[in-house]
């Protein structure tokens, strides 16, 4: 079964690249480019991890995490602060060995 990943960032272009990479690696990944949209997605379905992009920082990052964890308290957290090329690495670290497919 694919692990479900909720990705949150600011840039749709970067988000699209990250989603392609995660899906190619076997994850069921969905993305949002606003905090409200990410929270709405978390409320609609269970996710194994929340991947937060480097564009969401400071108080916005704290708000996103707080709101998502209020809905899904056991969600794993991963932070792709180094750009899209780090997303897969940090996600695998947060989840363990990665997707099981």
Predicted regions and their residues:
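Conserved N-terminal glycine/acidic-rich loop preference
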Residues: 35-36, 55, 87-91
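Short hydrophobic/Thr-rich beta-strand motif most characteristic of the beta2 strand and flanking loop
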Residues: 26-33
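Conserved acidic segment of CheY-like receiver
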Residues: 2-11, 18, 50
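Acidic, metal-coordinating helix/loop segments flanking the phosphotransfer/catalytic sites
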Residues: 33-47
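Ser/Thr/Gly-rich flexible loops in soluble cytosolic domains mediating phosphotransfer, phosphorylation
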Residues: 70-101
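Structural motif
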Residues: 8-12, 53-55, 80-82
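Conserved phosphotransfer microenvironments
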Residues: 52-67
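Alpha-helical interaction/dimerization surfaces of two-component signaling modules
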Residues: 21-22
